[in-house]
Amino acid sequence: MSATQKNNITRLEQLDRQSTQPFPNSRKVYLTGSRPDIRVPVREISLADTPTAFGGEKNPPVFVYDTSGPYTDPEVRIDLRKGLPDVRSRWIDERGDTEILPGLTSEFGQARLADASLDALRFAHVRTPRRAKPGANVSQMHYAKKGIITPEMEYIAIRENMKLQEARAAGLLDQQHPGHSFGANTPKEITPEFVREEVARGRAIIPANINHTELEPMIIGRNFLVKINGNIGNSALGSSIEEEVEKLTWGIRWGADTVMDLSTGKHIHETREWILRNSPVPIGTVPIYQALEKVNGVAEDLTWEIFRDTLIEQAEQGVDYFTIHAGVLLRYVPLTAKRVTGIVSRGGSIMAKWCLAHHQENFLYTHFEEICEIMKAYDVSFSLGDGLRPGSVADANDAAQFGELETLGELTKIAWKHDVQVMIEGPGHVPMQLIKENMDKQLECCDEAPFYTLGPLTTDIAPGYDHITSGIGAAMIGWFGCAMLCYVTPKEHLGLPNKDDVKTGIITYKIAAHAADLAKGHPGAQIRDNALSKARFEFRWEDQFNLGLDPDTARAFHDETLPKDSAKVAHFCSMCGPKFCSMKITQEVRDYAKENGLSDESKAIEAGFQEQAARFKDEGSVIYRQV
């Protein structure tokens, strides 16, 4: 074994230990479906009893959506060198419409496998890929249109509900504000049949490549919980395979529903294999990045044949969705000439350069139906890229952006003709007053295919804080109907994000997505808010920490000023102190009402006022007294 291999193995053993820590006072539980191999993970957060002073009652556990996969299950032994346990192979085999290939069929994949110099980097357990049988279509959309409810669809229905009926029965939803959904139509309970209908209609997608069998199925659509994506990937300037796998496991721990591998540096193929074999969430890529590496970064040298081989290479590895910039047409490129920031999408600029160099139409557009044939053979979903998205608020909603969007709508209908799943990528940089126009136009042009946006960033003045400038726009567009939000980290526009940046970006976007779910009135969205608010009022500090999106940070902030264990049961915090805590005062009012037989707080307050007025008169009505 080489020194490099030994070093890699040591790093991955350390990563194993980092990635398997359960959240405090939480445990992984599995909800079983109609068959024993449908085991849907959720995180159960146990809560303390309400103190006797506040009425003394049991508080039921709260179940939350869990993207962390087996990593937070202490019953599962994680070995990143072997990959995650299989989830879906039996379901795929039962359908009888796929075949195991004799080996990798892409030229590039075969060449990498034959290169002995890569042995130290390679994932040791490379799986033999499968593909649809000749003439077959294995997409979830194809099954949905045929009226088939797949195990993946049942799994998703259970996952989206998260024991909602039990929560209602326990009173966790006695308070939930009605939402304003802008035309979305989420039922009170998500059923497998509803999942099937939404996928068949094209309003939702299930990104689930038949070669990514470690995947825990999830859904992206405006009538479901708003999802978030986290980006990882190396560059020519740095990062290793180990660092990218670490970012993956860290990102899904904090709530990334999907992850995009945007690697542009060395060993893209090998890095992606490690990521896929250790990912319980869908993995997306931008294939044109790797295709460009194959021609040494010269966009003009790209060909359809190289791109096609790249699609097959990545599909056989198990990539679940491809960003493909097929809407960057030759006639749209001049429309960007007067922009402040021109073309800011890497994929968009690559294709624009190719179109201008050859004075030909984008080969991704002219070969689109051939791409569909590849996609449906592996069930890879389209993420139709917005290569002409605005890179500044000055360029928002211009002719180039909306021209491309109209073309993406045309391509969506072509993909649906092939029963290939589609979502649409969106901007970008958009001031708040223009965000709804983006959502409305996308729904109109793309016939309600799921929208997936990068933010949008609502202002350009805050480098280093673009997770905030974009989180504002993300919450808004999520409310208006966007199905998935691509996170932005504090390093946006500045550098490659590290592990801490990944966490910050994800937490910011979990807040935005949840705020959107609340605003839409998604059933069950308010359960966690209600539970945390009750814990806050009852001074159950540990429950407050544990119900939050980031228990570690909440606990650390509290402990900065009140580190002693006694502070965890105190009826105040360091913000107001013991004498000015509004919640403590409110409880005292309630106690006064109870002691004096008063039916509500307003009567208690009025009685208190009258009592103090009488005392003032009894003491001589003197404003100032000697003390």
Curated annotation (Swiss-Prot):
List of residues binding Zn(2+): H429, H493
Entry note: cofactor: Binds 1 [4Fe-4S] cluster per subunit. The cluster is coordinated with 3 cysteines and an exchangeable S-adenosyl-L-methionine.
Swiss-Prot/TrEMBL GO biological process terms: thiamine biosynthetic process; thiamine diphosphate biosynthetic process
Coiled coil: none
Binding annotation for [4Fe-4S] cluster: C573, C576, C581
Keyword tags: 4Fe-4S, Iron, Iron-sulfur, Lyase, Metal-binding, S-adenosyl-L-methionine, Thiamine biosynthesis, Zinc
Cofactor(s) this protein requires: [4Fe-4S] cluster
UniProt keyword Transcription regulation present: no
Binding site for substrate: N231, M260, Y289, H325, S345, R346, G347, D386, G387, L388, R389, E425, Y452
The protein's Enzyme Commission number: 4.1.99.17
Cellular component GO terms, alphabetical: cytosol
Compositional bias of kind Polar residues: 1-24
GO MF annotation terms: 4 iron, 4 sulfur cluster binding; carbon-carbon lyase activity; zinc ion binding
Pathway(s) of this molecule: Cofactor biosynthesis; thiamine diphosphate biosynthesis
Region (Disordered): 1-29
Domain of life: Bacteria
Catalytic reaction(s) noted: 5-amino-1-(5-phospho-beta-D-ribosyl)imidazole + S-adenosyl-L-methionine = 4-amino-2-methyl-5-(phosphooxymethyl)pyrimidine + CO + 5'-deoxyadenosine + formate + L-methionine + 3 H(+)
Summary of subunit composition and partner proteins: Homodimer.
NCBIfam families: PRK09284.1, PRK13352.1, thiC
HAMAP family xref list: ThiC
Role this protein plays: Catalyzes the synthesis of the hydroxymethylpyrimidine phosphate (HMP-P) moiety of thiamine from aminoimidazole ribotide (AIR) in a radical S-adenosyl-L-methionine (SAM)-dependent reaction.
Similarity field: Belongs to the ThiC family.
Annotated protein name in UniProt: Phosphomethylpyrimidine synthase
Organism: Pseudomonas aeruginosa (strain UCBPP-PA14)
